[in-house]
Amino acid sequence: MNFTRLGFVLAAVATVIAIVSAAYSQEKSSTNGSAHGIMRSADLKWTPIIKGCDLAALNGDSSAEGTPFVLRLRCTAGTKIPAHWHPTDENVTVLQGTFQVGMGEKFDAAKLETMSPGNFVSMPKEMRHYALSKTATIVQVNGLGPFKVNWVNPSEVVPPDAKPAK
């Protein structure tokens, strides 16, 4: 991967997260603490973040310091999420499908642990980890902002609009 593409990938991922956070915080939310609110799955606004994965903001502002947030990640079967880390703790609950998670600086299929619907994993800030969506998967991510994805090796990130390899 050349430096131009690397720069594009990093900028695209950061931009998508910022757009999703900003878009959600600008919407009038009935879950702002003054009243309860229901968000229907069909009403979620999904934004592609990497090839095979989309992100939707449910609650809070993931870019704001110390602010609680809830996001959903939807991935197609076979999608690899390269090794990365976050500056804050990350809590993940599998809602649908089979999701596999591994810890370390580099994707290693032998170290993946399988999670099924209802399973939960909590990763402390700065823990390097990676994932594989074994089947079509939806996971819910919650924590305190600012939530940011820092790729261990950005050249492994496949942009959402990348064409299949020939």
Set out the residue ranges of the language-model regions.
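Bacterial N-terminal signal peptides that target proteins for export
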Residues: 1-11
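Bacterial N-terminal signal peptides
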Residues: 9-19
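A short, N-terminal "cap"/entry segment at the start of jelly-roll beta-barrel domains
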Residues: 24-67, 156-166
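Double-stranded beta-helix
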Residues: 34-37, 110, 130-166
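Conserved short histidine dyad/triad with adjacent acidic residue
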Residues: 69-86, 114-115, 124-125
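Glycine- and acidic-residue-biased ligand/ion/polar-headgroup-sensing regions
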Residues: 76-79, 86-106
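Short beta-strand His + acidic residue motifs that chelate non-heme Fe in jelly-roll/DSBH
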Residues: 81-83, 101-102, 123-124, 128-134
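Short acidic-glycine-tyrosine-enriched beta hairpin
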Residues: 105-126
